[in-house]
């Protein structure tokens, strides 16, 4: 793939930046806003399927807030890249009750159902300039 490399060596001088990804979330940091998605023609059907197939799973579909089209999935990806990616690495392993997602992308469900593919993510991230190396490396490694 020839990413995370510079002249055959790891970008940033090391293969993993995990030690830099364990910062505690400061008390005065703004909680990133998780985008609200409008219901589409698919949303009602998706909720019915989830309730029928997974009746005993945790959670409710009343607050279903995920993209249901490729266009909105790519929009969610673009929002993550522009608003959250740079801080992702610093707080990648942090847990704090003020937000369930913080700087995470929440793209896994969209990958799992095929609304986006890893190449969509990686190609867009590679175009973004001035990303902190620990965010870049940590996120790309998760996608790969």
Regions found by a protein language model. Give the residues of each.
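Gly/Thr-rich phosphate-binding loop signature of adenosyl cofactor/nucleotide-binding cores
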Residues: 75-78, 82-144
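Beta-rich, aromatic/charged-enriched effector core domains that present basic-aromatic interfaces
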Residues: 1-69
């Amino acid at each position: 793939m020839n990413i995370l490399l510079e002249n055959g060596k790891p970008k940033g001088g090391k293969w993993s930046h995990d030690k830099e990804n364990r910062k505690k979330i400061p008390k005065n940091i703004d909680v990133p806003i998780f985008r609200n998605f409008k219901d589409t023609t698919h949303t009602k059907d998706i909720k019915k399927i989830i309730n029928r197939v997974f009746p005993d799973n945790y959670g409710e579909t009343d607050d279903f807030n995920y993209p249901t089209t490729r266009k909105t999935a790519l929009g969610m990806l673009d929002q993550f890249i522009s608003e959250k990616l740079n801080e992702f690495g610093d707080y990648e392993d942090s847990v704090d009750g003020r937000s369930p997602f913080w700087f995470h992308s929440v793209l896994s469900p969209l990958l799992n159902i095929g609304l986006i593919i890893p190449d969509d993510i990686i190609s867009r991230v590679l175009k973004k300039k001035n990303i902190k190396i620990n965010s870049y490396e940590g996120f790309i490694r998760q996608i790969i």
